Amino acid sequence: MAGLKILFVSQEITPYLPESEMALIGRNLPQGIQEKGREIRTFMPKFGCINERRNQLHEVIRLSGMNIIIDDTDHPLIIKVASIQAARMQIYFIDNEDYFQRKYILQDDKGTFFEDNDERAIFFARGVAE
């Protein structure tokens, strides 16, 4: 199992989103896997509430630039990366202006779910797979 490569995909990872059970799992599980000597890549959506400057996100040009078609519409895929220094772990962010620039994650400020959450989830999953 020495050459095992792991892809970890999570909707929430702390410190990028508020601490919750899922965000803590998204933060600690990949770190534990990495500490066991495994190669791991971690992905999450780049929601609009994530502060790019504070978290030092930057675009990975060589991975960005392709389009993902959803419902007969092209949507540019942007991939950004940041590091959790204490864990020596990189987190890759799937971004798209149409789907992830809102300041809320899955619901608006009134608690109403966004009507395109299904498309957003499809874009995220396909972006990770690409």
Feature map (PLM): residue ranges:
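Catalytic cores of nucleotide-sugar-dependent glycosyltransferases that transfer UDP/GDP/TDP-activated
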Residues: 1-130
